Swiss-Prot record:
This is UPF0178 protein YaiI. InterPro entries: UPF0178 (IPR003791). CDD domains: PIN_YqxD-like. It comes from the Bacteria. Belongs to the UPF0178 family.
Amino acid sequence: MTIWVDADACPNVIKEILYRAAERMQMPLVLVANQSLRVPPSRFIRTLRVAAGFDVADNEIVRQCEAGDLVITADIPLAAEAIEKGAAAINPRGERYTPATIRERLTMRDFMDTLRASGIQTGGPDSLSQRDRQAFAAELEKWWLEVQRSRGQM
């Protein structure tokens, strides 16, 4: 079981939460990016550098993730592919993607892409708030408790 991070777009405050969680959970954490990353020394944390290019990091995460893994990403198509493989997916704001919600999210993403392509300014997401950080940490903890229950450790 591994936590995979779409690290190029992941906010540093979320990475910090993940570093601490990897140590506490003693769970492998892999940050996938197309640039060098500095991470704290740990036997649980590693980086995987991929070539620059559209969706290269996403494709590598999809290739390597397995059922039971966790993928941290704001990229909806990546989350959809991870869910298809049986992994869980959480975005940096603490929202868990599920098979029930991912189709709706993909449809909304495609709609927003169409608006942008037609010249309509849609704006980006708000900056990450303290509430978002707390929601992320809470959802990560919830996922970890589910893992422990499934292993019979609770």
